[in-house]
Each structure stands twice: as C-alpha cells, then as structure tokens.
Swiss-Prot record:
Gene: acpP
Pathway where this protein functions: Lipid metabolism; fatty acid biosynthesis
Paired cysteines (S-S): none
Natural source organism: Leptothrix cholodnii (strain ATCC 51168 / LMG 8142 / SP-6) (Leptothrix discophora (strain SP-6))
Record protein name field: Acyl carrier protein
Modified residues (O-(pantetheine 4'-phosphoryl)serine): S37
PTM text: 4'-phosphopantetheine is transferred from CoA to a specific serine of apo-ACP by AcpS. This modification is essential for activity because fatty acids are bound in thioester linkage to the sulfhydryl of the prosthetic group.
Domain Carrier: 2-77
UniProt keywords, alphabetically: Cytoplasm, Fatty acid biosynthesis, Fatty acid metabolism, Lipid biosynthesis, Lipid metabolism, Phosphopantetheine, Phosphoprotein
Classification via SMART domains: PKS_PP
UniProt xrefs under HAMAP family: Acyl_carrier (MF_01217)
A GO CC annotation given for this chain: cytosol
Example GO molecular function: acyl carrier activity
Amino acid sequence: MSDIEARVKKIIAEQLGVAEAEVTSEKAFVADLGADSLDTVELVMALEDEFGIEIPDEEAEKITTVQLAIDYAKNNVKA
C-alpha cells in the first residue's frame, strides 16, 4: 500500500467514523460506508487539507469510492 493510499484510507475512516479495516478500495462512500452528502463534502475538504490540493466541485462529485479518492490524490499531489 502506498503512502498516499494509506493516508486517504485513514482520512476516510476518521471522517466517516468507520474502522480503517472497513475502508477498502471498492467501497462506495454512501452505499457501503454510510456517508451522507455533508460527509462527502467534509471528506473532500479533509483530502484537500491533507494533500495541499484543491478539488473543484465538478471533480469532487465524481469521487464516490475509496479507489477514486486514492486515484485522484495520486494524480494530483505534487511530488
């Protein structure tokens, strides 16, 4: 597991109040992890803070699973 992947999973677990073991790549925030729309907004903000990136609203709406969040972070974090 990459450092970015581990950090994303930790943030998701903290933001959604679930065990880190439950946060697997294929899980959807709403359907599988019980997030609501406010949770997803707060999650995006936490990812922005953690990685020092800005996620535009139109991109944030597409980030609906753990893997999509990991991919977005990997593709947008400056090395």
